[in-house]
UniProtKB/Swiss-Prot annotation, chains A, B, C, D:
Cross-link (Glycyl lysine isopeptide (Lys-Gly) (interchain with G-Cter in ubiquitin)): 228
A single GO cellular-component term on record: cytosol
Name of the protein: Low specificity L-threonine aldolase
Residues that bear N6-(pyridoxal phosphate)lysine: 213
Quaternary state and interactors: Homotetramer.
Reactions accelerated catalytically: L-threonine = acetaldehyde + glycine; L-allo-threonine = acetaldehyde + glycine
Gene, per the UniProt record: GLY1
InterPro entries: ArAA_b-elim_lyase/Thr_aldolase (IPR001597), Low_specificity_L-TA-like (IPR023603), PyrdxlP-dep_Trfase (IPR015424), PyrdxlP-dep_Trfase_major (IPR015421), PyrdxlP-dep_Trfase_small (IPR015422)
Sorted UniProt keywords: Isopeptide bond, Lyase, Phosphoprotein, Pyridoxal phosphate, Ubl conjugation
Function: Catalyzes the cleavage of L-allo-threonine and L-threonine to glycine and acetaldehyde.
One Gene Ontology molecular-function label: L-allo-threonine aldolase activity
Names of the cofactor(s): pyridoxal 5'-phosphate
CDD domains: TA_like (cd06502)
């Protein structure tokens, strides 16, 4: 029987700056998994799954939590649960993951139109940005009134200023709008800003809190909100095919980092990002946005830098990149930081002689690398995806 | 039995600049209606309906046409018919009617995401605008690849430059994208630019050609495309509830203006608009876009003009307005043009003393007029809708 | 320029038993149309459209009415308006038009699953039929709870017994379910049973009341319900592309028969159907259901009768048939009744020698007639559709 | 801080006859998990996930496989991937899980209507059942043509006769219809009938093969089909929120039983079921269908047995039941078999004195158990769901 076509064995995320989703389960997590509960979570009978849900809900000051296998699932069922009867639309940042990277779930599941807004300050949406794009429910039968504002914290690695969130929340309450947070990296926002999850919980009607990114769990997220909201979201989770059976092991492994000193782990990854940002600034390498937390976004357009060259320069130094976004996480080593500095500056120098104009909606160019890198070293095919 | 609560009798559109949909059936049309065929169009057995469909299809150089009761119906079933299997998205101008004023049909019927693009030149989308926002189908499972470009001609009253359309069409064909045209006012574009409908027909895979706006028919539009496209669109028309029975009278009345000198009628309405635009420019009243055809868009934001005051000033001179868009059509009189000049300049002067900052997505503010206008004259409630 | 490919001129519905939608506008209607109002109904400014809506609403004892271009449109927007947030399902008769002949609108517009029930008595659903198929909302996340019961009166020409409707209504109210009526032929039910429309209005939360079938109007229906319901339905009507402009003529023509002695007209058509039913029974020709009103359903399966032969036998006597359903309406002549008796009995005799077993979901076989009928007479291609 | 409200610790599935989803991970599986790969499966970089997918695909003779977190997810994305452009419908058994227990996914994700068919033989759909309910694509714009037949093997524990599947497949190919199999218990069908998975793979275009039911894995299923099909299904999996990161452990644990002697394990569970079926028959306790494999369906309606009493009688003997379906799996002990015999016969005797008429669409009554069982023993609340 012919051999399976298997990918190469994934050894470590220590040199993987493509995304913080590459964090790998630790030995401590594996040990914990052996003790996990074995109930069927669809029937609400798995202890560790319930413990995880209530732990994260309590941290966010919410009545209930729902374990979901991905952030896309928790975002999309949260938005669907807030929306009642169309025609309606949701408003979000034009870079929001719910709009750009969740494969049209908003249209398919929620039948929702989207008003994607470019922040006037370039970094995050202000209340004024929202008010000037919000579609009021004034009885106009042509329209699709805005029913929900979906924000992302962090977005593009930027920490959402708390006072702006408070202003937006007050206005939402006055206008009967729901406020959801894609908290794929809300742990990073909390760690960096010192704002406790509970305070974010007071602002947002629901938060999708990812576990498998900076927090290092194998899979999943927890969607938090009030009891009625989570009960209905559970129905949508089943409808989406997200109802899973013995999830105890996955829940127990996620609880390990939650019960550890996650703030220090995350702040370590932020420090690497801050250092790289300073390095770039010193070198005149333009960045897209302030590197508040674990991401550094190299402005490929302004630098006229070919993302494919950047990826290959990374490989030259045995560092994995996917494009303009450099994603630090707690498993990245200082050695990798030093190497990525070299890769970026060489790619920047290369761009000065070979300016590249990428004309696509995102700075990330699907890197169809050839067999040979710029320096002639053989490279296996890299399947890189947009961040 | 209590009397019905009926609206006031609508007498004439001569002074109605709210929209060109207010054009009223002419005596000639009424006469024609008496001779109309009486077959059941759902079974394809109504002569005048088939005659209208084939007349307009032939004018646009297309194989077939489908009579629809509204432009929203023909636009939405056209887009649905071009789209096969989600996840996908369509790309259009951020002001496009299919996106802003068709009550989320794109999400509900077609499960489509929308990439609304702000034209870099402020007037119409260039090929570069499209290429820099187009989502390629590169296998990225996060995305919703662009499958269709939907343009509008005219949009905001602006005639789409033919050469730009030709460039966009060539690129669409290279990239396997369909190109639809919301031709609510394509007659206006053709009349003003001299580009025959047939040439537009060569560029667009489908065109929704409205009959009830500048062309003065009571209801409807004709969706033109190839035979296979129209056959499938017929199925979606029935699904949307748009299959109608004895439509002969409506078809026959639409054919009257199509067989008349429609170009002169439209060019007359354009001349009124051009004259108003010049008047405004002379007075320093800012406009949003060039008044190529029958619309003049007063830039309420730049003029800091309260649309509600503008509407009431119009009523003072017995001219009906809905906000910043002044919509001429062939039934508007020169007398109305003179009166609307006065109304606009008084509203502009009023704004200099009472600057108004409208913070909404459209310049049109839903005019909740009081019982009394600015000059004390009693006014019945106006139900005005966004243009 | 080549001639248009036009269908033959449709002269009269006097011999057309395919469907009561073939009723043609009368001279009286054409006269009335000349006096019709000319306002834009999307803005609520057309007098005759508002008059039609309030007339029919008042007849049904409802707060408001909404003119729609087809029964499919009013049925589908009614059901969508009653449904709030999925997952949910509606329950109806397995032969219901909303389920079998509205091109999947329930799934596309309303995202609704359907529980189609076969009536235990073979004619209409009883409360027990409904209770034994109803999906309770008991928190089971696997299910799609029943939110709405959609009944049809008449269905298959059968008048729904009032007392059964009253029982079903009471149970619906106890269980928080909405009750919609597809009233494509509710006029026939009212005329035959003597139950006033107003009494049906007390039972059903909404009724889609067709105008273009037995009532002979060119197009449309009126959806009646409470004010809040109709306001939201208007939004869905626009979304479906059903918002039409100068609909005064169509409204005025519909009002003609409403203000005439429509009961006598309908009872005349019922009398023809009753006579044909008695004729069939006397001949041993099996019927599918009691011919309460204007339909006679020949049981093709039991009679082992080929619908294609029946259609062609009809043509032999210049009578148009589409299959097992014989649809009488007030424009059918007694002469046509006598001829269809001959056609049916000849087809029945033919079946005795050429038994035909149609194995399709409906008794109607899409009649791909050849150029020559059974008796050798040349026949134009008939495009017949399922009833 | 108040204690969490945790469910009781789930110890063993040995006495759990509610569903075979309650099978718990074995020590062997836990050991295997420790060696699992740690790549990110969204990027196709996890070795064990790819190995699982290719193992199951190869067993079913298919080009590719896709690991999904649930059978609902793999069923719904399979059906969506086969369907191109609505309006369309799918045809299935009225008891099919895709129709009754996947929370309206067919309407929400696929916009599909469903034709649920009652098998004429009471057990499984024959080709004739399908042909007499299939909606042909004959151009009828009222309809929603059948595009896909979704069968379930086993369904209701019944093994689908191979020759019937072969007949159905041939007819589907003639009529251009896709054929999907919900293989939640296809392992049971294969074990019992001796038909290899590969032969089922030749018949069905796609099969959703569950791992977490009789095969005992913690979560998931593998959807198998051709390469193009699986590539598109991957896009829908991401859209549904089913893209998960480090799934190596879950994949490795599923491979344990696949690489063990699963047939013996399953046949053991079947033997228990057969024994119970014989016991019931001997006692005159009516069954709904032949107990071919691991399920015994007590006909509650015919036995006039209250499912709530049955559940409580089970608890009296420390055996967990959810209603009429008794689900055996390889972790159930002979002791449990003996006890469930007692529970069922006592409930049956109880029914003779207290006949119960359950009037709901399914024989399973949501068991709102009181604090005390029929024999006075205190019982914790059971959250039982429909099978």
């Amino acid at each position: 029987m012919t051999e399976f076509e298997l990918p190469p064995k994934y050894i470590t995320a220590a040199n993987d700056l493509r995304s913080d989703t590459f964090t790998t389960p630790t030995a401590e997590m594996m040990e914990a998994a052996l003790e996990a509960s074995i109930g069927d979570a669809v029937y609400g009978e798995d202890v560790d799954t319930v413990r995880l849900e209530q732990t994260v809900a309590r941290m966010a000051g919410k009545e209930a939590g729902l374990f979901c296998v991905s952030g896309t699932l928790s975002n999309q069922i949260a938005i669907r649960t807030h929306l009642m009867q169309p025609p309606y639309s949701i408003l979000c940042d034009y870079r929001a993951h719910v709009y750009t990277h969740e494969a049209a779930g908003l249209a398919i599941l929620s039948q929702a139109m989207v008003v994607p807004v470019v922040p006037s300050n370039g970094d995050y949406l202000t209340l004024e940005d929202i008010k000037s794009h919000y579609v009021p429910d004034d009885g106009d039968i042509h329209g699709a009134p805005t029913r929900l504002i979906s924000l992302e914290n962090t977005l593009h690695g930027i920490v959402y200023p708390l006072e702006e969130l408070v202003r937006i929340k007050a206005w939402c309450m006055e206008n009967g709008l729901k406020l959801h947070c894609d908290g794929a990296r809300i742990w990073n926002a909390a760690a960096q800003s010192g704002v406790p999850l509970k305070q974010y919980g007071e602002i947002f009607d629901s938060i999708s809190i990812c576990l498998s990114k900076s927090m290092g769990a194998p899979i999943g997220s927890v969607l938090v909100g009030n009891l009625k909201f989570v009960k209905k979201a559970t129905h949508f989770r089943k409808q989406q095919g997200g109802g899973i059976r013995q999830s105890g092991m996955m829940a127990r492994m996620a609880l390990v980092n939650i019960n550890n000193d996650w703030k220090s782990q995350l702040l370590y990854s932020h420090s690497l990002a801050h250092e790289l940002a300073e390095y770039c600034e010193a070198k005149g390498i333009p960045l897209e946005s302030p590197a508040d937390t674990n991401f550094v976004f190299i402005n490929l357009k302004a630098a006229r830098m070919d993302p494919d060259v950047l990826v290959k320069k990374g490989l030259k130094y045995n560092v994995k990149l996917m494009g303009g976004r450099v994603s630090f996480h707690y498993q990245v080593t200082r050695d990798t930081l030093e190497k990525v500095k070299l890769a970026i500056s060489e790619a920047f120098d290369y761009a000065k002689e070979h300016p590249f104009d990428c004309n696509g909606p995102t700075q990330i160019y699907r890197s169809e690398s050839t067999e040979v890198d710029v320096d002639g070293n053989a490279i296996r095919e890299i399947k890189t995806y947009k961040y």
